[in-house]
Amino acid sequence: MGCLGNQLLIALLLLSASGIYCVQYVTVFYGIPAWRNATVPLFCATKNRDTWGTTQCLPDNGDYSELAINVTEAFDAWDNTVTEQAIEDVWNLFETSIKPCVKLTPLCITMRCNKSETDRWGLTGTPAPTTTQTTTTQASTTPTSPITAKVVNDSDPCIKINNCTGLEQEPMVSCKFNMTGLKRDKKREYNETWYSRDLVCEQNSNETDSKCYMNHCNTSVIQESCDKHYWDAIRFRYCAPPGYALLRCNDSNYSGFAPNCTKVVVSSCTRMMETQTSTWFGFNGTRAENRTYIYWHGRSNRTIISLNKYYNLTMRCRRPGNKTVLPVTIMSGLVFHSQPINERPKQAWCWFGGEWKKAIQEVKETLVKHPRYTGTNKTEQIKLTAPGGGDPEVTFMWTNCRGEFLYCKMNWFLNWVENIQNGSRWTSQNQKERQRRNYVPCHIRQIINTWHKVGKNVYLPPREGDLTCNSTVTSLIAEIDWINGNETNITMSAEVAELYRLELGDYKLVEITPIAFAPTSVKRYTTTGASRNKRGVFVLGFLGFLATAGSAMSAASVTLSAQSRTLLAGIVQQQQQLLDVVKRQQELLRLTVWGAKNLQTRVTAIEKYLKDQAQLNSWGCAFRQVCHTTVPRPNDTLTPNWNNMTWQEWEKQVNFLEANITQSLEEAQIQQEKNTYELQKLNSWDIFGNWFDLTSWIKYIQYGVLIVLGVIGLRIVIYVVQMLARLRQGYRPVFSSPPAYVQQIPIQTGQELPTKEGEEGDGGGRGGNRSWPWQIEYIHFLIRQLIRLLTWLFSSCRDWLLRNCQTLQPVLQSLSRTLQRAREVIRVQIAYLQYGWRYLQEAAQAWWKFVRETLASAWRDLWETLGRVGRGILAIPRRIRQGLELTLL
C-alpha cells in the first residue's frame, strides 16, 4: 500500500506539472520592430530663409540618415498618403503665395474695344487677309520644299534682341468702358488692355468699335489677387512625426508600383523636393539620374518619365518689354488692376537647350523595355505628340515664370524633336505651325484654371520690365496611347500631380507599433509594484531599433529592453527637437495653412506616446518590456516560429485577434485591481487602533446581529432534527396526535414494567430486542469505513515520513558534524583575527605615542631656536646703540 501511495502521489505531481506547462498565456512585448500604414499629417522642413520658408516650414538641419532593413514591403506611388499630402500642400502653398482674396466677378460689362485689333486677332469675324494667310493658302495647294530647322543657342544674337524668327507681338486689345466708381451718381470712363484670349466680342459688327466682354463673366467663382506675389521654386522635405517613420523602396527597378520590394530603407524625413507647377514637363526635380526610368500607374496608362540628366536638358523663358500697371477703383475696398501699354511688346517665348533628340530617343527605348508596355518595338513608330484639345493648360505647355503664367504653343518644338517635315501630322498644321525650331512662342494670361480644384482665378497683370527664368527639365508627364499594333503615341499630359508622385512615390508613411502579443508558458506572478530602470541609456536614435526588423522574433526579443528604452528616448528626443525648431520659428504663431499643419503634427506625436503608455497601463504592464499576464492564449492554432519569423510577419497573422486580446487583458487587469483592493482592506486589521474606529464598531454590530440570528436558526434546526429522530423511533408528541390516534404500547417479554412515568420516553431504546433502523446502520457503516480510510492514510503518511527520516538521518548527522567542525574552524580563525587586531591596535598606539612625543620635542627645540634668533634680531639695535655709546665715550 505504501508503494502504491507513493506512485499515485508522483503521478499526480507529474500530471499537475505537465498541465501547468502546457497552458500558454498571452505575453505583452514592448519595443518590437513592427509597423502599420498610417495617414497622419507630415510636417515640412526647409533651408529657405524667405517669407514662405519662415512661415510655412520648420528649419532644416540636414541630419537625416537612412537605415537599411531586411524586410519586404509593398509600395504604390498613386495610392500613397505622402504624395497626396504633397499635392494638397503645394496647392495650398500655390494659393497662399499668389493669393486671391476678393470674391467677385470683375468687369462683367460691355466694353468698346479697338476694332482693328479685334479683327487682327480674330475676335470679330474673319481676320483680314495677310501675306501670311496667302502663304498658308498656297502651301495647302502646292507642295513646298522641306523647311530647314531653326536651332538657337545662348550665343545667338536673336536671343539678346528678342527677334528670333516667327515671334510676334503679344495679342492684346485696348478697350474703354464706363463704370460707377466711388460716387454712385457719377460714371467714369476707364481704359483697359486685355489679352485677346480673355475677351469675347460680337461678330461682324459694322460699328467703329467692337463690343466685347470678358469670356468668364458667367463664372461665379472668380477671384482677383489682392497683391502681386513672387513665386519661385522652393526646396523642402517632409518629415514624419515622432512615433512614425518613412519607408523607401531602394530598388532601381521600382516603377511606381511594387507589391514586394525587398530593398527597403527607413528614415525620418524624405529627400529634398521642388515646388513644381507645370504641365507637360517637370522642372528642377530631385529624382533625375544618369538613366531614364518610367513610373507607370497600376490601373491606367498614366506615366511620369524621369529624363536622363546626362543630356543637360534646359528651358529658358523670357518676357521682353515694359508694361505700366494702373489700379482701377471699382468701389470702396475693391480695386482691379489694368495695364496700359506704353509700346507694343514682343510676346514671351521659351527656348530649349541640351541634347533633346537623344533624350527622347532614350525615352522610347526605355518604354519598349518596360514590362507594362505591349505596343510596337520599333522606336521610329513611337511619337511624342501634343494632346488633342481641352483647357488651355492641356493644349499649351503651362508653367510659372517668376509669378507669371506662361502658355506656350509647342508645335515647333515637337516638329524639331521628332524631325517632322511631311506626313499627316505636318499637313494638319497651319502655316505658322509648320516650323522645326527649338524655341516656342508663349503668351501670358490673367485668368487661370486651377490645376488642383475646379475653378478659375484672376491674377494681376505681369510685372513691369523683362522677366527671365531658367529651369532644368527633369521629367515628362505623359499618357501612353496605342493607336494600333504598329504605332504608339506618348501624349503629353496636364496632370500636375504626377510630378509629386515621381518625387515621393517611393516613400510610404508607417506608424511604429511597439506593442505586440505572443504566447508563452510563463504566467504573471504578483509583485508589490513595478520598478523603473533608472540606469542611463545610450540613445542610438529613434530608428535604430528598426534595424532588427528583419531578424527572428527570438533575436529581437533578447534586445527588447534596450530597444524599448531607445524607442521611448527617441520619441522624446524627436519631440524635443521638434519643439526646439518650433520655438525658433516664431512666425508659426500666425498659424498659416502649413503652420497649423506643423502644430497638428506635434499634437499627433504627443497623442501617440500617451496612447501607448495609457494602453500599457490599462493592462498592468507600465514600464515593462516583457509583461506576462494571466490571460490564456485565445487561439491554439497560431504559434510563432521564434527562430524564423519576424515580428512584422507575426503581427500580420494575429492582427484579427488584437481586439479580443486587448479586451481580455483589460478585464484581467480590472479583476486583479479588485483583488488587490480587497487584499489592501485586510491590511487595516494589522493596526490595533483601527479596531476602535466608529466605522468598525458599526461592522461589529452587524456581525453580532448576524451571529445571534445564526444561533437562533441553528437552535431551530437542531429542534427539528431531534423531533424527526424521535418520530423515526415510533413516537409522536402528544400535542400533535390526531383525534383517532390510539397509542400502541410495545409488549416487552422477560422484563419488568416501568416503575416511573418519566422512563416511558426512554423505554423504546433500552429493549434487548430493539435495533437501529437500517438508515442509521448504513450511516454508521460509512463512518466506520471513513475512519478506517483516514487511519490508513495517516499510518501510510507516518510510515513514509519515518522511512524518509531514517534515510535522511545519516545525511543530517554528517551535515551536523561538518557544520560543527566548520564552526570550530571559524571560531579559531576569529580568535586569531581578534588577537592580531589587538596586536595591531597596540602597535598603532605605540607608534602614535612615539610620533607625538617626537613631534612635541622637535617643536619645542624649534620654538626655542626661533625664540633665540628672534631675540637676537631684536637686540641688534640695542647692541648698535651700546657700541656707539662706547665709541663716543
From Swiss-Prot:
This protein's GO CC annotations: host cell endosome membrane; host cell plasma membrane; membrane; viral envelope; virion membrane
Region V3, annotated ranges: 317-349
Entry keyword annotation includes Signal: yes
Chain positions covered by the region annotation Immunosuppression: 599-615
Region (V1): 113-174
InterPro entries (UniProt xref): Gp120_core_sf, GP41-like, HIV1_Gp120
Extracellular side: 23-704
Coiled-coil stretches noted in the UniProt entry, renumbered to this chain: 648-675
GO BP, sorted A to Z: membrane fusion involved in viral entry into host cell; symbiont entry into host cell; virion attachment to host cell
Chain positions carrying an annotated carbohydrate: 37, 70, 114, 153, 163, 178, 191, 206, 218, 250, 253, 260, 284, 290, 301, 312, 322, 377, 422, 470, 486, 489, 635, 644, 660
Listed Low complexity bias regions: 126-145
Post-translational modification, as annotated: Specific enzymatic cleavages in vivo yield mature proteins. Envelope glycoproteins are synthesized as an inactive precursor that is heavily N-glycosylated and processed likely by host cell furin in the Golgi to yield the mature SU and TM proteins. The cleavage site between SU and TM requires the minimal sequence [KR]-X-[KR]-R. Palmitoylation of the transmembrane protein and of Env polyprotein (prior to its proteolytic cleavage) is essential for their association with host cell membrane lipid rafts. Palmitoylation is therefore required for envelope trafficking to classical lipid rafts, but not for viral replication.
Residues bearing a lipid moiety (S-palmitoyl cysteine): C797
Motif Di-leucine internalization motif in this chain: 888-889
Single Gene Ontology MF annotation: structural molecule activity
Region feature V4, mapped onto this chain: 408-442
Listed transmembrane segments: 705-725
Annotated segments matching region V2: 175-217
Chain segments carrying region Disordered: 120-145
Cytoplasmic topology ranges: 726-889
Region (V5): 485-492
Protein function: The surface protein gp120 (SU) attaches the virus to the host lymphoid cell by binding to the primary receptor CD4. This interaction induces a structural rearrangement creating a high affinity binding site for a chemokine coreceptor like CCR5. This peculiar 2 stage receptor-interaction strategy allows gp120 to maintain the highly conserved coreceptor-binding site in a cryptic conformation, protected from neutralizing antibodies. These changes are transmitted to the transmembrane protein gp41 and are thought to activate its fusogenic potential by unmasking its fusion peptide.
Domain notes: Some of the most genetically diverse regions of the viral genome are present in Env. They are called variable regions 1 through 5 (V1 through V5).
Protein name: Envelope glycoprotein gp160
